């Protein structure tokens, strides 16, 4: 990239430092995807590209800004069986101070799983585990091992992403004048659960058939 010819700074690993609006420390230069070191997934790059295109070209209202958050980046391992997850594990949630409830359900305990020949105790009997804050019922994490895992945890990801999002500074030292204004006013973006834009602003793991529904 010949960054030495610019004023763009990198971290100790060599990744370009970006803030929540994908800005670098050089005015007018943005960075997204693997080069900023924030989760090396195609769907994370898609998410960042959507944010940039919205803010730079598609925004129609003055107070309509999108910003990046990285605590709900889904991941899928396309092995047999598939493994998919988003959010916290039970151990991570408890370490963060949450009192949690854990729900676990096997494929074989459903009619569809049984009709597919999945039986309790067999190696192909997948399961989904959901981590919830006990008091509020807030979903903290969803984890699936089994057939089509990449699809099965998408509804939880959608629900986890819905609601009010308070702007949180990433690299506070990086920021345009507009970014500083939004930080100072504690900008909030509200993603209603029954509005199509909320689906559009939720990550979907790539490649997964859930992209068919999420990109409609």
Label every model-predicted segment:
Residues 23-24, 69-70, 120-124:
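Solvent-exposed alpha-helices and their adjacent loops that cap or buttress functional pockets
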Residues 79-89, 94-216:
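Flexible, glycine-rich terminal cap/loop adjacent to redox cofactors
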Residues 6, 74-75, 128:
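Small-molecule pocket liners
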Residues 32-94, 151, 205-216:
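A conserved FAD-binding loop/helix module that cradles the flavin
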Residues 1-62, 155-158, 169-172, 183-190:
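FAD-site-proximal beta/loop scaffold in flavoenzymes
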């Amino acid at each position: 990239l010949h960054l030495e010819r610019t004023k763009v700074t990198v971290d100790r690993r060599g990744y370009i430092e970006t803030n929540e609006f994908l800005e670098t420390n050089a005015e007018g230069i943005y960075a997204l995807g693997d080069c900023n070191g924030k989760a090396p997934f195609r769907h994370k790059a898609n998410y960042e590209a959507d944010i940039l295109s919205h803010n730079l070209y598609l925004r129609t209202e003055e107070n309509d800004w999108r910003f990046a958050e990285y605590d709900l980046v889904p991941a899928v391992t396309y092995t047999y069986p598939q493994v998919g997850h988003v959010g916290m594990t039970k151990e991570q949630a408890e370490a963060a101070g949450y009192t949690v409830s854990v729900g676990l359900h096997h494929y074989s305990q459903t009619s569809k799983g049984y009709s597919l020949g999945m039986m309790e105790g067999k190696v192909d009997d997948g399961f989904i585990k959901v981590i919830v804050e006990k008091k509020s019922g807030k979903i903290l994490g969803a984890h699936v091992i089994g057939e089509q895992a990449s699809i099965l945890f998408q509804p939880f990801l959608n629900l986890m992403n819905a609601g009010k999002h308070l702007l949180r500074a990433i690299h506070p030292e990086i920021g345009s004048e507009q970014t500083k204004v939004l930080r100072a006013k504690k900008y909030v973006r509200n993603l209603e659960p029954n509005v199509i834009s909320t689906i559009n602003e939720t990550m979907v793991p790539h490649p997964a058939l859930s992209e068919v529904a999420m990109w409609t």
